[in-house]
């Protein structure tokens, strides 16, 4: 548990830690009997522009709890002295407590682990290089921007990093590539891969979190970092597929953007990082000059109750946003249960995962000459074998050898368990029947086919009607377009926001199922250096790449303005106009807690008309509304702060969504919009109220001109419900007849005294 001061309410941040230094001395003796472990200490905004002076102040602070200057110096793991001030050090629990007791200290918390969570994607999203007036060409494909990744490293030989035809490296870039095992900057970096660093000091002294297979360099064994960077910003690579599946030209969302990798993920099996290492990478990325940060990492969910600020990812991202760097992060992969969404803070752009209009299948031809298709990502040769039904696949294994096995399961984990069991017992293949409209994402080198219960029952009837049932399974094939329905994936974590329910999370959805990307050629599941990845990890770089394009078009927009443009222009249906569903039990129409504002639409986002902008004063509003005292807020923001009395309402944060988790009586919510479209514009309000909720907008019309670029409005919310309810959903739009600026409305009724 972290040690935090100046807190009057239960926790805001998960997973980060920090402190502040103003030169106050507390003399203490180091306890030689206590175990030392890494603590991350955040000191808020830098007191000096000179990074050496900042580091010296860290040294002096540590000397106050150590017996000698040398011992203090040896305890330091990382100095954070570029984008913000802080350090990671090996401390005893009592030393951490002594630091936290200082009047100039904000918080201290122990180092933790943090988990990681294309040939069709961008055509599906309408982002085509063949459109001369589209956002791709208008932004020069992101050529002048650098996108940073905090991930597992790169495989630099991948064609995704080809720099042919790229212009010189942007002048604002100050980063570099660092040499290491099998990584030579002169050979492996170029005008595409412009930065590559690795960080190991945040692990324990014997580096127990680092796999022996990995490289002590920016080179990544696992390939996750190569995947996410290629999804966001791969150069054009023709004739790519995964063993014949998903064939086409691979490209990132921003094909000319430059890539900087900060390797912080080392555990090959669990794909984890440490918080101390992550904070150091944030600090370096800010100083290097990245323009956008993509982070496929999240704290574990569901969230435990917390009474301290321990938000490494959250506070690192806050400092980045304060420097004008948008931070895009995944919602996590613990859905479809409610309250599982991660990365829930208002300065982050949090991404849920959907499928796209592409699936992979195999033909199953049975001995009665009936052919049925099932989902499969099998890339091997055609298989002919006997067919057997096994109800209890864990214990009844004697009949599996050389046969294709049919079994029925209820849960996701059972699919993997059945696959492992049939593989060990040398079955020729596996057909799994499962309830619901589930999209399989398992890539395997033997026939593995998913069907629903209805199809499974047909296959079972054939088996029982035949004395010697047989099956022939084709190699996998690719199907694009109708009739594949767009849906939010079952694994994609769901809202509401468990820490600040009035802040909608996730914010946006993007494709994250069977996404083709480049990977490490050392990785066993790689097929010629490519892989089909599934998870919010892969939806995140889709949005990050699109943000690069928007920032290239609008370099003066703040991260909040870019986020607003993404959210207010999102599709509420799929690109063909069909409804978006949400996987789960039962399957349902998607709502804002599944997909945020909707499915990302970059072409509309380039010209949103109006934006809900935020700056440091808005974030101070958020901190005050959630219970932080003036001293704590001043430390973390660097701006002298005195919260109003009574405290401001979190409902009035200028967020591009209105979420009211506990409507007891009529409430009025305020928002401000900034005109980024034609100077002389008139917008009128259009409301689709949640069921049983009355919405009144004042004024109903907004008139902008050269002297009026920002206008405020009020939304009065009341309900006719007489009892407690769940959430009801609607939307609110400002429209000028061409541009529709839409935000989600989410309201839950709480009648405390019926």
UniProtKB/Swiss-Prot annotation:
Residues 121-606 form the Peptidase S8 domain. Its main location: secreted. It comes from Arabidopsis thaliana. GO terms for cellular component: extracellular region. One of its GO terms (molecular function) is serine-type endopeptidase activity. Pfam families: fn3_6, Inhibitor_I9, Peptidase_S8. Residues 1-28 form the signal peptide. The keyword Repeat does not apply. The active site is at residues 151, 224, 537. Residues 39-116 form the Inhibitor I9 domain. This is Subtilisin-like protease SBT3.12. Transmembrane segments: none annotated. Glycans are attached at residues 206, 239, 369, 629, 740. Belongs to the peptidase S8 family. Residues 29-117 form a propeptide. InterPro entries: Peptidase_S8/S53_dom, Peptidase_S8/S53_dom_sf, Peptidase_S8_Ser-AS, Peptidase_S8_subtilisin-rel, Peptidases_S8_3, S8pro/Inhibitor_I9, S8pro/Inhibitor_I9_sf, SBT. The gene is SBT3.12. GO terms for biological process: proteolysis. It is found in: Secreted. Keywords: Autocatalytic cleavage, Glycoprotein, Hydrolase, Protease, Secreted, Serine protease, Signal, Zymogen. PANTHER family: PROPROTEIN CONVERTASE SUBTILISIN/KEXIN. Its EC number is 3.4.21.-.
């Amino acid at each position: 548990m972290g040690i935090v001061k100046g807190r009057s309410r239960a926790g805001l941040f998960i997973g980060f830690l920090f402190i502040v230094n103003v030169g106050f001395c507390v003399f203490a003796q180091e306890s030689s009997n206590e175990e030392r472990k890494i603590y991350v200490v955040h000191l808020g905004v830098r007191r000096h522009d000179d990074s050496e002076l900042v580091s010296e102040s860290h040294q002096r602070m540590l000397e106050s709890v150590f017996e000698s200057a040398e011992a203090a110096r040896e305890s330091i793991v990382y100095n954070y002295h570029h984008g913000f001030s802080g350090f990671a050090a090996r401390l005893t629990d009592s030393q951490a407590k002594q630091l936290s007791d200082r009047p100039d200290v904000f918080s201290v918390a122990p180092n933790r682990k943090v988990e990681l969570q294309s040939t069709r994607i961008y055509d599906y999203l309408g982002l085509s290089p063949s459109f001369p007036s589209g956002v791709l060409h208008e932004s020069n494909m992101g050529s002048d921007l650098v996108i940073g990744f905090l991930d597992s490293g790169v495989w630099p030989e991948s064609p995704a990093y080809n720099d042919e035809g790229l212009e010189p490296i942007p002048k604002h870039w100050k980063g570099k590539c660092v040499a290491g095992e099998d990584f030579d900057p002169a050979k492996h970096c170029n005008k595409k891969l412009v930065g590559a660093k690795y960080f190991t000091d945040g692990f324990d002294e014997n580096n127990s979190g680092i796999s022996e297979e990995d490289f002590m360099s920016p080179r990544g064994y696992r390939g996750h970092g190569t995947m996410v960077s290629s999804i966001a910003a791969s150069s054009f690579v023709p004739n790519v597929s995964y063993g014949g599946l998903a064939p086409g030209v691979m490209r990132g969302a921003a094909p000319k953007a430059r890539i900087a990798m900060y390797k912080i993920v080392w555990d090959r099996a669990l794909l984890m990082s440490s918080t101390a290492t992550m904070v150091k990478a944030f600090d370096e990325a800010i100083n290097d000059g990245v323009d956008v940060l993509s982070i496929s990492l999240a704290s574990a969910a569901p969230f435990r109750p917390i009474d301290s600020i321990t938000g490494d990812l959250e506070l690192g991202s806050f400092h980045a946003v304060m420097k004008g760097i948008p931070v895009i992060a995944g919602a996590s992969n613990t859905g479809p249960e409610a309250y599982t969404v991660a990365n829930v803070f208002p300065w982050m752009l949090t991404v849920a995962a959907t499928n796209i209009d592409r699936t992979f299948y195999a033909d199953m031809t049975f001995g009665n000459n009936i052919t049925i298709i099932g989902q499969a990502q099998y890339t091997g040769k055609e298989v002919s074998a006997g067919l057997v039904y096994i109800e209890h696949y864990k214990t009844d294994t004697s009949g599996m050898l050389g046969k294709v096995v049919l079994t029925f399961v209820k849960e996701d984990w059972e699919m993997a368990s059945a696959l492992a069991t049939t593989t060990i017992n040398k079955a020729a293949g596996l057909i799994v029947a499962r309830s619901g409209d589930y999209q399989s994402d398992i890539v395997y080198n033997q026939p593995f086919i998913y069907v629903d219960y209805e199809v499974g029952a047909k296959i079972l009837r054939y088996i029982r009607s035949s004395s010697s049932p047989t099956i022939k399974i084709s190699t996998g094939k690719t199907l694009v377009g109708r009739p594949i329905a767009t849906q939010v994936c079952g694994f994609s974590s769901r809202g509401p926001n468990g820490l600040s329910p009035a802040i909608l999370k996730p914010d946006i959805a993007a494709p994250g199922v069977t996404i083709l990307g480049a990977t490490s050629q050392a990785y066993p599941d790689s097929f010629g250096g490519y892989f089909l990845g599934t998870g919010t990890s892969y939806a995140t770089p889709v949005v990050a790449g699109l943000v690069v394009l928007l920032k290239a078009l609008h370099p003066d927009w703040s991260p909040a303005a870019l986020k607003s443009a993404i959210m207010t222009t999102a599709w509420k249906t799929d690109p063909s106009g069909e409804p978006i569903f949400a996987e789960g039990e039962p399957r349902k129409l998607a709502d804002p807690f599944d997909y945020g504002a909707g499915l990302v639409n970059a072409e509309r986002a380039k010209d949103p008309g109006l934006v809900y902008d935020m700056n440091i004063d808005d974030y101070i509003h958020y901190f005050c509304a959630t219970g932080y005292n003036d001293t704590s807020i001043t430390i973390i923001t660097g701006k002298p702060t005195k919260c109003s009395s009574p405290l401001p309402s979190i409902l009035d944060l200028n967020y591009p969504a209105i979420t009211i988790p506990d409507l007891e009586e009529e409430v009025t919510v305020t928002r401000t919009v900034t005109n980024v479209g034609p100077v002389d514009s008139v917008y009128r309000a259009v409301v689709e109220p949640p069921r049983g909720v009355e919405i009144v907008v004042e004024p109903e019309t907004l008139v902008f001109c050269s002297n009026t670029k920002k206008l405020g409005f009020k939304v009065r919310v009341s309900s006719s419900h007489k009892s407690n309810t769940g959430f009801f959903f609607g939307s609110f739009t400002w429209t000028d007849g061409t541009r529709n600026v839409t935000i989600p409305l989410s309201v839950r009724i709480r009648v405390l005294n019926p």
